[in-house]
Regions:
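Helix N-cap/beta->alpha junction signal
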Residues: 33, 56, 86, 165-166, ...
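Short hydrophobic/charged patches on amphipathic alpha-helices used for structural packing
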Residues: 38-41, 71, 229
């Protein structure tokens, strides 16, 4: 009998699916009332948990940082796997898990409430090279459609949207307009296509790029915040980050990064730009920087992009606004 410790709140679909799955096979589940990194590790030790489930960097980063605290000497030998879903789980944070727990397996899963589980990747130490997003093996049903609702050819590099057929919802309750947008029919078959952009690799695996509703359009180029966030968060002086689009007269939008610094001194825009150029394409590098005391996220750990857009709207140009410091280069 295996023991699962899901950390995301019960309101989150991934937690619900994990608990139901464990129950169906007779495994044991431990619930934690509130996310507190050291309490998680204490429970793993005392309950001999074999697997924990998190929501990306929002939970992963505090967990690995807790293991670096003085006196953090936990017996985690029972832990076999760390599973993440619903939010970006960046390569640097995965590497930190492997530094502390070299024998675990990391499972990166993608999906949505509208489609269920679309795929997963099983990662071991040394296999965390930074990519645009997770590259997962398809679990049957998902395809990637282009703008004309034609299947994207594997290995073509064409960006499309993930769509899934099979056991999918009828629609959104009392929202026929949104239902018609997301639940589509192609060649007589119903699909759920909530808006996740992806490419198909030559071997048939899918690389998730991000949700189209939060993508940035700069000079006609589509930029997915998740890739930029992964690069910014990996900066040693950054604890957390959210990336959104800011209005730009020339390009339509420019990349704006909102960061929560690790210490009292925040990195400058120049420092962030110089660092990011080693990890992402030049046109994706942030052109505007906001520094805040705390990055806001939903209870499930997902980035609060509405809050982030409000931060950018309040301080659109280079200025000093107390709680949020902004710099921009145009």
């Amino acid at each position: 009998q295996l023991t699962l410790l899901p950390i995301a709140p019960l309101m989150h679909g991934a937690t619900q699916w994990s608990i139901l799955g464990q129950s169906l096979v007779g495994n044991r589940t431990i619930l934690i009332p509130k996310f507190e990194p050291h309490e998680v590790w204490r429970l793993v030790e005392s309950e001999k948990a074999n697997s924990i489930m998190i929501t990306g960097d929002a939970m992963g980063k505090p967990l690995v940082e807790a293991l670096d605290d003085p006196g953090a000497d936990y017996d985690l030998s029972s832990l076999l796997a760390v599973t993440s879903s619903a939010a970006l789980f960046s390569a640097p944070v995965k590497d930190e898990f492997f530094r502390h727990l070299p024998n675990i397996v990391i499972v990166d899963a993608i999906g949505s409430s509208e489609s269920g589980n679309n795929g997963m990747a099983t990662i071991t130490k040394g296999d965390t090279a930074m990519k645009s997003g997770p590259t997962v093996s398809v679990l049957g049903g998902p395809v990637v459609f282009d703008e004309d609702l034609k299947p994207v050819a594997p290995g073509s590099g064409t960006i499309g949207k993930i769509a899934r057929t099979g056991n999918i919802p009828v629609g959104y309750y009392n929202d026929p307009v949104k239902s018609a947008e997301v639940f589509i029919t192609v060649d007589g078959k119903r699909y759920s296509m909530p808006g996740d952009f992806a490419t198909i690799e030559a071997d048939g695996t899918i690389t998730l790029l991000g949700r189209g509703s939060v993508s940035i359009n700069s000079g006609g180029e589509k930029i997915f915040p998740e890739e930029v966030e992964s690069a910014v968060r990996s900066h040693p002086a950054v604890l957390d980050a959210i990336v959104v689009g800011a209005p730009d007269e020339r390009w339509g939008q420019r990349v704006a990064a909102i960061i929560q610094p690790r210490g009292e001194v925040a990195p400058s825009l120049d420092e962030i730009q110089e660092y990011c150029r080693d990890h992402i394409a030049g046109y994706k590098v942030p052109r505007q920087l906001h520094v805040v005391e705390l990055i806001e996220r939903s209870p499930s750990g997902k980035p609060d992009y509405r809050w982030a857009n409000n931060i950018v709207a309040e301080v659109p140009e280079a200025s000093d606004s107390g709680g949020a410091r902004t710099a921009s280069d145009s």
